[in-house]
Amino acid sequence: MRIRIEKAKRRLSLWQGRQCLYRCPVQLGRCPVGPKRREGDGRTPEGAYRVCSRNPRSKFYRALGISYPAEPDARAAFREGRIDRDALRQIESAVRKRVRPPWDTPLGGWIMIHGQPSDGRPVARDWTAGCVAVSDADMAWLFAHVAQGTRVIIRP
């Protein structure tokens, strides 16, 4: 099973082999074009990740944590001097162990697929800090059907 998020189409789909099991609209980070490069840039990452955590009591209804940053994100950042060797090694180790990578590096973290704000406030089209938001009804379905470790592909 895998989740595919197409940023330009604002769409999430859940696939089992060649069969699409579920599809829903998404809202992205407040700066939706381009890959995430650093903490606070408001961008949603692009690349291959995994669901690395599940939160049934998120302040955004429910949440599935995404394993950003992944090795390609970390290697590019190291080459460009945006993270040090220690941060690179920590991220590589987490990826090998299939656990949550460190979310406190200069690359940012805490990227989730989640529901809507619990305070009921209206939100803009793309309003998150870099996460992927769906309706609470869509999040309930996804949370019931998506296991930890599921692949997540985020495309431009």
Describe the role of every protein-language-model region:
Residues Q19-C31:
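Short Gly/aromatic-enriched secondary-structure transition segments
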Residues C24-P25, G34, A74-A76:
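A short, polar/proline- and glycine-enriched secondary-structure boundary/capping micro-motif
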Residues S53-P156:
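Exported/periplasmic cell-wall-interacting domains
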Residues M1-R2, A8, L28-S53, R98, ...:
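N-terminal post-signal-peptidase region of extra-cytosolic proteins
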Residues S13-W15:
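Core beta-strand residues in small-molecule sensory/regulatory alpha/beta domains
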Residues K7-K9, G108:
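Residue-level signal for tight coil/turn positions that link beta-strands
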